[in-house]
């Protein structure tokens, strides 16, 4: 059987699969062509949310993550999920950066410090990761382990730290390792706006033992609440013993593990520890601020001294060039689908209207801006309306025309198109408009698919996440405007040799399986890092 050409990936953005009902606009729409293909062609559904796309369990999918997974051909884990998965798998406890920090403190007979945002917020850090580090220290028999808790109050309730402290104290008691040495509101310890005077107060508590004083973390938090200060704004506080001496400070020869996985609010404090040119950098910053006529702080903070022989580990890469160990370095999508096609000398065409153009280019290509050799692109402007329920067809007719030109040019081996309508109109919450949006997509495919089949090509039709199939909120009965956790449809339309009598699409797939499926149709071998599996099962 000759290789199909072109192989076309059609992404019906936001068209999920759900039972019929008054809120399922995709089902309510008059879409005879899509309905027929779903019924008569090889069909399956794909996991497009939660763990299937590298998000936390139960989290709705989105277009950025969806297209990243589609193009990568493997599950692209977001940092929270990646670290939590490493804990579950056990890989966390053999992480080279963590083990190097532990070896450092053993060789220097020094202390291990764990610092980061405290609690289950999951935006910048997660308490499970801190608990796992305590477990690691216990397994490795590290005796001196000190905790520096940055209180949240933003990604969680403003005064919730005491509850998280109960949990942490239970872990410490169970493992017999860990002593809380400082607490500080994230306002100080996690500033990202070059307000160095805030960072300086946190650093002074951590390194010099200078700040508010309390006999325990609980006492520090309760004292703040008594002064009507919520978690975020708790002044950097040093925990002291019965003699008024700090329980611990970070010293020369120690090791620090910064538990934040989101980079932006970890950079500044990390620089305070490891940047040899910090004071000059701060001075230049305030000189620029002064030249721009901006107000300066009453006192410009300068680091008294930089710690020596410090082993500093960040959970993820906060910034290129920092002299730190990175526990979970960025995992780049080195050979996305478009790269494999390009390396084979094939031509490809990526098209969408403005709203979804970055998704079929930047995100599908693994975060790469530039096209690969042999990759052509076409951007169709989205209509300029206040909200897309006013024009539910959006630019689908124009996308279809340009797509037909690409197909009939016979230049391309692979084509990808995104129809934005079900998602973008779905966000308006208007069921009549979303019905029209789905009908506009059906009308476009009614013209496109025959042109593909006439040339001996095939079309793989999918969605990247759900939306249009759930327009009524099950809790409130009001409009539902968000994405869903419903699966995405996936069906293959082709000529002889591609019907249900010849092949089927396996169940249990996810978006990461799309690229290997397309490469099988293109008769190309997936690269080693493309761990997704083709959905095609050939009937014997």
From Swiss-Prot:
Question: From the UniProt record, which GO molecular function terms apply?
Answer: manganese ion binding; phosphoglycerate mutase activity
Which amino acids does the record list as binding Mn(2+) 2? Answer: 13, 63, 464-465
Q: Which cofactor does it need?
A: Mn(2+)
Provide the cofactor note recorded for this chain's UniProt entry.
Binds 2 manganese ions per subunit.
**Where substrate is bound, by residue?**
124, 154-155, 186, 192, 262-265, 356
Which keywords belong to this entry? Glycolysis, Isomerase, Manganese, Metal-binding
Its Enzyme Commission number(s) read 5.4.2.12
Give, as in the UniProt entry, the pathway in which the protein acts: Carbohydrate degradation; glycolysis; pyruvate from D-glyceraldehyde 3-phosphate: step 3/5
Catalytic residues, chain numbering: 63 (phosphoserine intermediate)
Point out the signal peptide segment: none
**What reaction does this enzyme carry out catalytically?**
(2R)-2-phosphoglycerate = (2R)-3-phosphoglycerate
The reply to whether Manganese figures as a keyword in the UniProt entry is yes
Q: How does it assemble?
A: Monomer.
What NCBIfam families has UniProt attached to this entry?
Answer: pgm_bpd_ind (TIGR01307)
- Report the protein's function: Catalyzes the interconversion of 2-phosphoglycerate and 3-phosphoglycerate.
Q: Which HAMAP family match?
A: GpmI (MF_01038)
- Can you say what this protein is called? 2,3-bisphosphoglycerate-independent phosphoglycerate mutase
């Amino acid at each position: 059987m000759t290789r199909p050409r072109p192989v076309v990936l059609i992404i019906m953005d936001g068209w999920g699969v759900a039972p019929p009902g008054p809120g399922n606009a995709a089902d309510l729409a008059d879409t005879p062509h899509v309905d027929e293909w779903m019924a008569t062609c090889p069909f399956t559904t794909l996991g497009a949310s939660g763990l299937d796309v590298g998000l936390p369990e139960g989290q709705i999918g989105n277009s950025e993550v969806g297209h990243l997974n589609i193009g990568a051909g493997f599950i692209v884990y977001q940092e929270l999920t990646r670290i939590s998965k490493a804990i579950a798998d056990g890989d966390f406890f053999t992480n080279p950066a963590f083990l190097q920090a532990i070896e450092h403190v053993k060789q220097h007979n020094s202390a291990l410090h764990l610092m980061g945002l405290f609690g289950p917020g999951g935006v910048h850090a997660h308490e499970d990761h801190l608990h796992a580090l305590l477990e690691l220290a216990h397994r490795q028999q590290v005796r001196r382990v000190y905790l520096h808790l940055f209180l949240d109050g933003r990604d969680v309730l403003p005064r919730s730290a005491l509850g998280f402290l109960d949990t942490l104290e239970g872990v410490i008691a169970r493992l017999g390792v860990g002593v809380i040495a400082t607490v500080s509101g994230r306002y100080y310890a996690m500033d990202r706006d070059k307000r160095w005077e805030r960072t300086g107060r946190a650093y002074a508590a951590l390194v010099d033992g200078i700040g508010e004083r309390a006999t325990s973390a609980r006492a520090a938090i309760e004292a703040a609440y008594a002064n009507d200060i919520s978690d975020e704004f708790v002044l950097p506080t040093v925990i002291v013993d019965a003699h008024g001496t700090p329980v611990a400070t970070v010293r020369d020869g120690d090791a620090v593990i910064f538990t934040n996985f989101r980079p932006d609010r970890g950079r500044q404090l990390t620089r305070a520890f490891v940047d040899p040119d910090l004071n000059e950098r701060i001075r230049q910053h305030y000189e620029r601020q002064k030249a721009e006529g901006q107000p300066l702080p009453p006192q410009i903070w300068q680091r008294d001294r930089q710690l020596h022989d410090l082993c500093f580990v960040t959970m993820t890469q906060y910034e290129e060039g920092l002299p730190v160990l990175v526990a979970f370095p960025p995992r780049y999508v080195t050979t996305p689908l478009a790269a494999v096609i390009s390396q084979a000398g094939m031509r490809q065409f990526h098209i969408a209207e403005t709203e979804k153009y970055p998704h079929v280019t930047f995100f599908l290509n693994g975060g790469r801006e530039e096209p690969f050799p042999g990759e052509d692109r076409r951007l169709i402007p989205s209509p300029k309306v206040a909200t897309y329920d006013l024009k539910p067809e959006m630019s689908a007719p124009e996308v279809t025309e340009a797509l037909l030109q690409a197909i009939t040019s016979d230049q391309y081996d692979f084509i990808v198109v995104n129809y934005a309508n079900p998602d973008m109109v779905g966000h308006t919450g208007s069921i009549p408009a979303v019905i029209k949006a789905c009908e506009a997509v059906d009308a476009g495919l009614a013209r496109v698919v025959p042109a593909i089949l006439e040339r001996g090509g095939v079309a793989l039709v999918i969605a990247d996440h759900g939306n249009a199939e759930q327009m009524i909120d099950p809790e409130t009965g009001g409009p539902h405007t968000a994405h869903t956790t419903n699966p995405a449809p996936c069906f293959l339309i082709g000529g002889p040799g591609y019907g249900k009598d010849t092949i089927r699409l396996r169940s249990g797939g996810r978006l990461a399986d799309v690229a290997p499926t397309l490469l099988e149709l293109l008769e190309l071998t997936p690269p080693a890092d493309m761990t997704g599996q083709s959905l095609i099962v050939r009937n014997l």
